[in-house]
């Protein structure tokens, strides 16, 4: 396994891969967990090469967010990737990836400033900026992203379509801890009592899923069930919303190819979860 830390070396490595070989890519900010490993394993199963990036991207953090505190565990991450069997890690510096007076990026006007983008208006512009840079360097055939970040997945799929990129965005199922909480690098911020409170989020997802499987499709009814479940704990709810794959709100009947998205703060930690229908 190669550990690559410069753009020059990344370009050299990529140029050495034969044209008839496929490349899978997993973009991460490090602090790797089993959710990331599931993305790597999906890539390893479908591609000749799997490249993982580890880069805590400053442009997707807001002014009062946790960029400085975000966990950085590069040595452990490298060991984990080596055990899984990925081909290469790309772990550049901020100075390598960004120059002064960068070309500006913006998120899609409809998709990028609702839900997560409402509370974090610069977030998706930063995500698109770094992912496009990484795509340009690595030139993958497939890129693997977790469905936990549903809005991110849909916006990246739109970017690929809009820019005519020959890259397939592969959404991968949410991975959960034994207690049901969706895996996230930020879960380490939770105290034991906060984690117990946070479990109302996956319980709500399961409750909504169960009612849909039983035949309930009225949005108002399902949302009321969800809100009652979420209000059982002392958490700050940002949204509990049914949307289609264009992130347009569904207000009457839940149909196939819908998503139920939840974002809530437990203590000081923002948590996401969702149900793909």
From Swiss-Prot:
<dbReference type="GO" id="GO:0005524">
    <property type="term" value="F:ATP binding"/>
</dbReference>
<dbReference type="InterPro" id="IPR042176">
    <property type="entry name" value="Pantoate_ligase_C"/>
</dbReference>
<feature type="active site" description="Proton donor">
    <location>
        <position position="36"/>
    </location>
</feature>
<feature type="binding site">
    <location>
        <position position="60"/>
    </location>
    <ligand>
        <name>beta-alanine</name>
    </ligand>
</feature>
<feature type="binding site">
    <location>
        <begin position="183"/>
        <end position="186"/>
    </location>
    <ligand>
        <name>ATP</name>
    </ligand>
</feature>
<comment type="subunit">
    <text>Homodimer.</text>
</comment>
<feature type="binding site">
    <location>
        <begin position="29"/>
        <end position="36"/>
    </location>
    <ligand>
        <name>ATP</name>
    </ligand>
</feature>
<dbReference type="GO" id="GO:0015940">
    <property type="term" value="P:pantothenate biosynthetic process"/>
</dbReference>
<dbReference type="GO" id="GO:0004592">
    <property type="term" value="F:pantoate-beta-alanine ligase activity"/>
</dbReference>
<comment type="similarity">
    <text>Belongs to the pantothenate synthetase family.</text>
</comment>
<dbReference type="InterPro" id="IPR014729">
    <property type="entry name" value="Rossmann-like_a/b/a_fold"/>
</dbReference>
<comment type="function">
    <text>Catalyzes the condensation of pantoate with beta-alanine in an ATP-dependent reaction via a pantoyl-adenylate intermediate.</text>
</comment>
<feature type="binding site">
    <location>
        <begin position="146"/>
        <end position="149"/>
    </location>
    <ligand>
        <name>ATP</name>
    </ligand>
</feature>
<feature type="binding site">
    <location>
        <position position="152"/>
    </location>
    <ligand>
        <name>(R)-pantoate</name>
    </ligand>
</feature>
<protein>
    <recommendedName>
        <fullName>Pantothenate synthetase</fullName>
        <ecNumber>6.3.2.1</ecNumber>
    </recommendedName>
</protein>
<keyword id="KW-0067">ATP-binding</keyword>
<dbReference type="Pfam" id="PF02569">
    <property type="entry name" value="Pantoate_ligase"/>
</dbReference>
<keyword id="KW-0566">Pantothenate biosynthesis</keyword>
<dbReference type="GO" id="GO:0005829">
    <property type="term" value="C:cytosol"/>
</dbReference>
<keyword id="KW-0547">Nucleotide-binding</keyword>
<dbReference type="InterPro" id="IPR003721">
    <property type="entry name" value="Pantoate_ligase"/>
</dbReference>
<keyword id="KW-0963">Cytoplasm</keyword>
<keyword id="KW-0436">Ligase</keyword>
<comment type="pathway">
    <text>Cofactor biosynthesis; (R)-pantothenate biosynthesis; (R)-pantothenate from (R)-pantoate and beta-alanine: step 1/1.</text>
</comment>
<feature type="binding site">
    <location>
        <position position="60"/>
    </location>
    <ligand>
        <name>(R)-pantoate</name>
    </ligand>
</feature>
